[in-house]
Amino acid sequence: MEIQTDALIIVLAYMVGMMVVGYVVGKINIKGSADYLVAGRRMGLFMVAFSLSANNIGGGCTTGLAQKAFGDWGISAIWYVLAASLAMIPLAYFAPKIRKTMAVTIPEVVGRRFGKVSSNFTAVLSVLSLFCLTSSQIGASGAVIHALIPTIPANVCLLLAGFVTIFYTTFGGMIADQVSDLIQFGIILVGLAIATPIVLKHAGGWAEISAALPGEKLNFTQIGWASIIGYFFNYFCTFLCGPEMVSRFETCKDEKTAVRASLLCAVLMAAMAIFPTLLGLAAFALQDKLELAEKGADAMMVVTGAYAPGIITGLIAAAIICATMSSADSNLLCMSTMIINDIYPGFGGKKKLNDKQVIFYTRLCNVIAALIAMCIAMFKVPLTTMNTFAFGIRCAGPFAAYGLGLAVPNATKNSGLISIFTGTIAFVVWQFLAEGGTLFFMMPVVFGSLVSVITFCLVNLIERSRGIPAAPSAYVVEEAK
């Protein structure tokens, strides 16, 4: 009961802190729509790097990673996050280009180069995906609170998580999101960095734990190189076309900061990969002494609760909630931003909104979308399959149009437009054939992105050989010259 009390105090303190951040930022820092949507484009290295890291680290990279290490993956589970870390390195090439666009959203950039149809289709895919992800992540945050503090009813936990997310995101916008991301990732990293050596020491030390593990558990490539490479490409594709990632690069104070933030994020994520993996292995070695759920689903919390002080367990509890909530707030704000910035004008919105109206309607979208998401989560609507599908479909189609649209100045309009449709169709077909998994060691989002790139290059080659002019620039500065 002491552990639950410590966890409750720390988790509630964290949630109150997040609401205070949102309120203060909203009152002091939000002067116009640029402040609300892209943090005034003045964020520094550490703010952006920690925000990128927080958005990459979800429940799957904390409790999920420990569970994989406990299961068949062993120490090779570390690649589940290390692959994401490595994917941030080539992303550093695109980071300054993203910042240079001076855009707010991905559909805005796609529309500049390849026209209104491309922009509208990309916006619809992104908004549907972000809504599904927001729904599941608010639900996941509530479920984590309930699992850690079961004395609070599940629906109350869900409402609590949803209300906190709505409050600080709606009041503080992107600035509050980034400040909260900094705090959240700090809690995750510091909490796990403190807890892991304490657990290992009280469990007999790493030498004793490793001696109790089967040999395959200590094989760094147990999952196979095909899976490792597949995860790398999967992360790269989803990062480049992920609204929550792109929006962070848009907030950088300059292009150099964007490059450095991407590389620092890679370092931070590599550090994060270590701790849950070690805790999962410790839980496996000590499983005869622990009351674990099936397949070690709660391995990280159980081994921490058994071998670390209550306050450390509470810190880990807050870290797990941070991991899910940091994704929920970003997806919620990105979705509302696209509705006002892209969907509204793209589908017939006549009235040009001023700064105050943009902020008001974006905040209204935040509240409405989050309330609907909370209702869906309360009725236990299964979203896992839908989320997997939505997460890929927002990236596979627009991958070439956005990524190569930034990098290939001579691209034609049809190369971007056609690649969006072929990439999306390829993703859907591969998702069906692979039944949501992999086929020939290739994940659906990677296959869809590959098809979109091939289509983009072929159409562009054919049209340029026929003398068709290049599409307009993705960069406002170049268009103004």
Regions found by a protein language model. Name each.
Residues 1-481:
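Membrane-embedded helix-loop-helix hairpins and adjacent transmembrane boundary segments
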